[in-house]
C-alpha cells in the first residue's frame, strides 16, 4: 500500500499551532480593499482557526506535515 502524501495546496495555506489547532488566512482580503473600511481590512488581515467541522478532513490531508 503506498504512503499517503501531504496535500500540496493545503501545505501552503494551513499552519499548525503547538496545541494542534489549524490556522488559515481569511477570505475577502486580497483586493478591492478601498471599498472596505479600515476596521474590516484590519480584522481580515488576522489569521483565524479552521472550523471544527472542517478540521478532521483537513488533518487527514496534511497528516504527514509537522
Swiss-Prot record:
Transmembrane segments: none annotated. SUPFAM superfamilies: L35p-like. Pfam families: Ribosomal_L35p. GO terms for molecular function: structural constituent of ribosome. GO terms for cellular component: cytosolic large ribosomal subunit. Keywords: Ribonucleoprotein, Ribosomal protein. One of its GO terms (biological process) is translation. InterPro entries: Ribosomal_bL35 (IPR001706), Ribosomal_bL35-like (IPR021137), Ribosomal_bL35_CS (IPR018265), Ribosomal_bL35_sf (IPR037229). The keyword Metal-binding does not apply. Gene3D superfamilies: 4.10.410.60. HAMAP family: Ribosomal_bL35. Belongs to the bacterial ribosomal protein bL35 family. This is Large ribosomal subunit protein bL35. It comes from Acholeplasma laidlawii (strain PG-8A).
